[in-house]
């Protein structure tokens, strides 16, 4: 009798485990986002994983019948966004950096099924500079909250450069650089974004080996969660900037000095074979540590003069094309499936340098479908530079995929500002433009976060809408 009872209990438990194992992971992860954010999973809630359509764009549907809330979504992020859209639109809750609230009535009023389809395949979040102004000293607990915030607000393509320097140091040590030479190049954590873009080196001291190891451990947790949530992280690639110590290893190295705000950096010539050697070694070492990637962010000439030939010359065009070919080779030789992501800040900010001829030359060096330009600051075109939108000025970005993005925060400032109607509806002009070209994504790239929360509620909603939003409603 005792054996029979034990066998019955074992079979019952195995059935429960088997049943749990058959649940889509997307649903389990979405439920955990809600529990972590609001402290509980509403009894009235049911998630349903839907089949995505051929467009590659996510969608969700919301309905309430007999008091039961049903959220259908094509991905984990779509499920989270669907739930958050419902509670926010009904006034039942909010999730932001100041705090979270969820207060559902005992019985939810019935709601006719409402479908929301995003017009974009990607929903980008963060800026290279966010990792200097806001996040450099975040721990896992803080990152976990931000990842949940991203999912609820519908962002599925976050930047993920944490531990870049730890991996880069490995590559350079293998090449023969001393730790002293590497440390002389590295900045402190808060200045690393500008080091990655070739703007500065050496400022504020190099981090310790213990700090690097901590960043590697942190990045493993960040990426594990991003992947569990179905996100598409943007890793860092190699833009060609190297320590001064490289001259000792390779006296014949072809280096150009670049200058930014009183700082100088060394840029490898795209004709030098060691450019691809270093870049591909970095990608291999990165993927050996963190697994396969697809999207690699490489920022070239950010707020820098182009050090190749005269503006408008064939020499400049040819060298820019060669530079792009070299960057892409440094990615593709290590990972043939890699896509180069490029922040297009300089295309709007420095049009005296980046004329259409130069931009077309740069972009033409990479096959279509293998380079995606982030049109970083569309709001600056309209309200700061008073200039033509890049998708028009550069003829649809010459056939390259691109992402519409805004910079609602500059320099980590905390002023309560923002043109809400533009953030809600500005992307509709891009979607309707005859020069929209290969517009595949929508995003926001604040230099600092944890501020101005109302703006981000509007921005995140806009990324899932192809219709005009009335911000006063």
Residues covered by each model-derived region:
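Contiguous, structured surface segment used for ligand recognition
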Residues: 20-120
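Stable alpha-helical elements in mature extracytoplasmic
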Residues: 26, 30, 79, 83, ...
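Catalytic-core regions of glycoside hydrolase
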Residues: 42, 94, 100-109, 126-130, ...
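N-terminal structural segment of carbohydrate-active enzymes
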Residues: 81-82, 120-161
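Solvent-exposed, acidic/flexible segments
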Residues: 23-27, 72, 76, 118, ...
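Short, intrinsically disordered, charge-balanced linker/junction segments flanking boundaries
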Residues: 16-20, 470-473
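Sec-dependent N-terminal signal peptides
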Residues: 4-13
